[in-house]
């Protein structure tokens, strides 16, 4: 990633964490189709590796605005993809892909963080990885902790996430018939890949 700042990347990770952590409510649905969001998407598309993924997401958002009962339909998609059994789903947990579910706990401890009691999901949930990456990118921009230490932890987190993210994304594409969460996961995959290469 060359044109996006550390804070902008942090915001993308935080936004994706929110969208993968719970179903969209009416306010989020309105916001995702807003002019402000269109400006944000335009900024993201200025980063060439993200362009195709953002275009795909924008197409889904445009289709979403004319979908009957969009919020209820997206809630059903969310539930079917992320809350059911793994037979025809894309469970958002490292352990669902035979990865060490304790790794994220070690990374959180190293970052001086812990999971919130308000988030009733296991610590190896995708949203926790994304919140940690968001925190680390914000920390890079603040300059209060040595950049080398933050960058080392960022690379460890990206490596741990990359162990299972491609399979998660493939499952989103396979089982999300409408495509909104598949498009979100594709944007995440490209973002993580670019972030991982930006050492």
Swiss-Prot record:
Any Pfam family:
Nitrate_red_del
Its annotated compartments are: Cytoplasm
Q: What does this protein do?
A: Involved in the biogenesis of TorA. Acts on TorA before the insertion of the molybdenum cofactor and, as a result, probably favors a conformation of the apoenzyme that is competent for acquiring the cofactor.
Q: Name one GO biological process term.
A: protein complex oligomerization
Q: Which SUPFAM superfamilies match?
A: TorD-like
Query: Which keywords are on file for this protein?
Result: Chaperone, Cytoplasm
What name does this protein carry? Chaperone protein TorD
Per its UniProt record, what InterPro entries does this chain match? Answer: Chaperone_TorD (IPR023069), DMSO/NO3_reduct_chaperone (IPR020945), HscB_C_sf (IPR036386), TorD-like_sf (IPR036411), TorD/DmsD_chaperones (IPR050289)
Question: Which HAMAP family has this protein been placed in?
Answer: TorD
Q: Which residues form a coiled coil?
A: none
Task: Tell me the protein family, please.
Answer: Belongs to the TorD/DmsD family. TorD subfamily.
Q: Which GO terms describe its cellular component?
A: cytoplasm
Chief subcellular location: cytoplasm
Has UniProt tagged this entry with the keyword Chaperone? yes
């Amino acid at each position: 990633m060359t044109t996006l700042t550390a804070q902008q990347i942090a915001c993308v990770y935080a936004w994706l964490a929110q969208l993968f952590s719970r179903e969209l409510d009416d306010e989020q649905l309105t916001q995702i189709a807003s002019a402000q969001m269109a400006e944000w998407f335009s900024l993201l598309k200025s980063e060439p590796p993200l362009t195709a993924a953002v275009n795909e997401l924008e197409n889904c958002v445009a289709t979403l605005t004319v979908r009957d009962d969009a919020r209820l339909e997206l809630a059903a998609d969310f539930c079917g993809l992320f809350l059911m059994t793994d037979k025809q789903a894309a469970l958002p947990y490292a352990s669902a892909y035979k990865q060490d579910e304790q790794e994220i706990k070690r990374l959180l401890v190293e970052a001086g963080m812990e999971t919130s009691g308000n988030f009733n999901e296991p610590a190896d949930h995708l949203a926790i990885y994304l919140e940690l990456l968001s925190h680390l990118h914000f920390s890079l921009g603040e300059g209060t902790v040595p950049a080398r230490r933050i960058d080392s932890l960022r690379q460890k987190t990206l490596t741990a996430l990359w162990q299972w993210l491609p399979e998660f994304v493939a499952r989103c594409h396979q089982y999300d018939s409408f495509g909104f969460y598949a498009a979100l996961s594709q944007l995440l995959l490209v973002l993580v890949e670019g972030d991982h290469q930006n050492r």
